[in-house]
């Protein structure tokens, strides 16, 4: 497993991460540092979904979700909020793109507003990459 730290620019709700070649691998979100999210009245609207367009859409992950992160009601902070995975969920990327497109939105599909309000901002995140293993034959275990 390879861990890569990124400092990226969030434009609106989209992050683009350039890659040196098309990614035929598994990917997982390890941690993310984001500015304060403007809170809403209910808990549902204070969760964010982090999706990746290059993740394979499957029966159990049709929305290409990397992670859903609930923040609950939060108090204003001057600095970044940090979220770290206790368990890394790996998802298959099978794309000819030489980039990853990651989107951050509220679980209710509304735009996540950060404080202070500005169009572009820096985020820090760590992604885990693993090679896709060739499936073993069931005869290997006999």
What role is predicted for each listed range?
Residues 1-142:
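Flexible assembly/topogenesis modules
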């Amino acid at each position: 497993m390879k861990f890569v730290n990124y400092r990226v620019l969030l434009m609106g709700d989209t992050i683009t991460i350039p890659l040196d070649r098309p990614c035929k691998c598994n990917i997982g979100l390890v941690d993310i540092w984001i500015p304060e999210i403007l809170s809403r009245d209910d808990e549902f609207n204070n969760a964010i979904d982090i999706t990746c367009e290059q993740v394979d859409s499957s029966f159990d992950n049709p929305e290409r979700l990397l992670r859903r992160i609930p923040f609950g009601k939060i108090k204003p902070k001057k600095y970044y909020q940090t979220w770290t995975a206790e368990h890394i969920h790996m998802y298959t990327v099978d794309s000819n793109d030489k980039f990853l497109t990651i989107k951050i939105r509220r679980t209710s599909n509304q735009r996540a507003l950060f404080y202070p309000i500005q169009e572009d901002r820096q985020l820090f995140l760590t992604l885990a990459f693993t090679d896709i293993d060739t499936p073993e034959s069931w005869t290997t275990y006999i």
